[in-house]
Amino acid sequence: MNDYIVVKCGGSMLDQLNDVFFDCIKKLQQQYKVVIVHGGGPEIDAKLKDCNINVEKRDGLRVTPKEVMDVVQMVLCGSTNKKFVMNLQKHNLLAVGCSGCDGKLLQVQPVSEEIGYVGEVSYVETALLKGLINMNYIPVIAPIGIHDNEIYNINADTAAAGIAAALSAKELILITDVDGILHEGKLVKKTDESEIATFIEKGVITGGMIPKVQAALASLKMGVQKISIVNGTKDFTEDTGECIGTTVTRGVSIV
């Protein structure tokens, strides 16, 4: 059990997770060393609305001036992270919640001044993750990072990909509410970069699946070898640890 697996769970999925999801995490833990990264978009947007702070997005990234970053930090590192940790522990999964600024876990480079406190992962302090795992804890990471002693928001997909690449993880698992990529009503079990481009061009991949596959492609570019898009509301893990869904690699596809 030397291989790492990184599981990314978007904020919109956190309230949909059922017993099946936690059973799948237990199965993964029997085969791999597990790290979880979570988002929190819906809860952040709701809190910003409560605070009467307008939200602007550019190219899918939330524009994050200081007052927005304060709310992002409060939600991601506070309520969202701790609720997820408590839910894992309710299902007998020992977990430790932390953010990318704890122990300088996630160091970032700012994306641009125009979008404020938004960063991309430049360095991962893997020793912290490995230490927690060696003590039989699952690290549960809120995707914020640091740069020059300032806190930055990180897209959860790219945070998970950065962590997976730094750990040389066997796989990055993207938890969604769909079974994977469907083609003519059938699940595409394996695909690659070129086939995904064809699927998008032909309209096979549309709507909410497009950002999911774009996240998978971005992860490949960051050095992750394999990404699986799975349905977190169903049993997505074989007893062997293999995922049930769509697996994206750089190699030749087998549909």
Swiss-Prot record:
One BP annotation, GO: arginine biosynthetic process via ornithine
GO molecular function: acetylglutamate kinase activity; ATP binding
Assigned keywords, A-Z: Amino-acid biosynthesis, Arginine biosynthesis, ATP-binding, Cytoplasm, Kinase, Nucleotide-binding, Transferase
Compartmental location: Cytoplasm
InterPro entries, sorted: AceGlu_kinase-like_sf (IPR036393), AcgluKinase_fam (IPR004662), ArgB (IPR037528), Asp/Glu/Uridylate_kinase (IPR001048)
Main location: cytoplasm
Family statement drawn from the similarity comment of this UniProt entry: Belongs to the acetylglutamate kinase family. ArgB subfamily.
Name of the featured protein: Acetylglutamate kinase
Higher taxonomy: Bacteria, Bacillati, Bacillota, Bacilli, Bacillales
